[in-house]
């Protein structure tokens, strides 16, 4: 069952207007969330990020965040996931519009919520990662800070990584600094300091990234947000990537160089597990 514009419908009966700007122009936003035993983790944070992005793009929210939260829970229940581990996606588009780029004067946004059972990938060995060569993050673009529907660079990067036998692409920005993973934020222990690309480097302000930075304070782990060169990443003592579904995934190889699963990664993974509902 899909939640579409105010009601639950069977997936095969969920119809989107062919003139929807999300389909035609990627004019919209999305959030990916994880539920543990039916409890959606960091739901308010995800909805706040979506609301902030919608305000930035002048896309009206068809419902207030508490009502969207209710719809999320309804979607879980309708898919028999009210007590299960699940992955959810909330998609917001500007809705249908006339031909051309300019948005309609009175948009009728489309809101879609979907849910499916989630089974985490095996994490005992960690991810193999490679630097993406064909796609980059534009650190100067407004959309680099927003979780927009325009994910083609990420698709290209992840396709390239898969072709190389890797699990995750590491994307650089236009200044050859590390920005993020194809579907993740990147952290590395460099010269004894846990370091992550600053938002200004083209990193998405991830919900899990924010949680890790907060955990570093409570765990008294020194952390820095700054530009990271590819050469620095190659010499890192530890690397891990984060997102809402993966949580903290250690990296066992970057561009052919093997890495151990380090103490900082294990410590933060343990602390993060304590945050789960």
What are these regions (language model features)?
Residues 1-170, 174-175, 204, 213-277:
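Conserved alpha/beta cores of soluble small-molecule-handling proteins
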Residues 177-199, 205:
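Glycine- and Gly-Pro-enriched alpha-helical subdomains that act as flexible
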Residues 208-209:
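Secondary-structure junction motif
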């Amino acid at each position: 069952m899909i939640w579409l514009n105010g009601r639950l419908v069977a997936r095969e009966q969920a119809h989107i207007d062919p003139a929807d700007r999300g389909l035609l122009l990627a004019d919209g936003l999305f959030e990916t969330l994880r539920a543990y035993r039916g409890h959606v983790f960091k739901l308010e944070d995800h909805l706040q990020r979506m609301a902030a992005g919608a305000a930035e793009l002048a896309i009206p929210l068809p419902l207030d965040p508490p009502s969207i939260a209710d719809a999320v829970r309804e979607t879980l229940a309708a898919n028999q996931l009210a007590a299960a581990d699940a992955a959810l996606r909330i998609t917001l588009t500007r809705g249908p519009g006339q031909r051309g780029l300019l948005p309609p004067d009175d948009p009728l946004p489309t809101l879609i919520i979907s849910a499916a059972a989630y089974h985490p990938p095996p994490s005992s060995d960690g991810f193999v990662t490679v630097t993406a060569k064909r796609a980059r993050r534009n650190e100067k673009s407004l959309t680099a800070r927003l979780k927009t529907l325009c994910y083609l660079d990420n698709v290209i990067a992840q396709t390239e990584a898969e072709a190389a036998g890797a699990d995750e692409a590491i994307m650089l920005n236009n200044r050859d600094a590390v920005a993020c993973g194809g579907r993740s934020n990147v952290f590395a222990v460099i010269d004894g300091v846990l370091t992550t690309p600053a938002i200004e480097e083209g990193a998405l302000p991830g919900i899990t990234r924010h949680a890790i930075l907060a955990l570093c304070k409570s765990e008294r782990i020194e952390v820095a947000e700054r530009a990271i060169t590819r050469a620095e990443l190659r010499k890192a003592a530890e690397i891990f990537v984060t997102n809402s579904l993966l949580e903290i995934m250690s990296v066992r190889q970057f561009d052919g160089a093997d890495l151990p699963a380090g103490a900082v990664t294990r410590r933060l993974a343990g602390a993060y597990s304590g945050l789960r509902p």
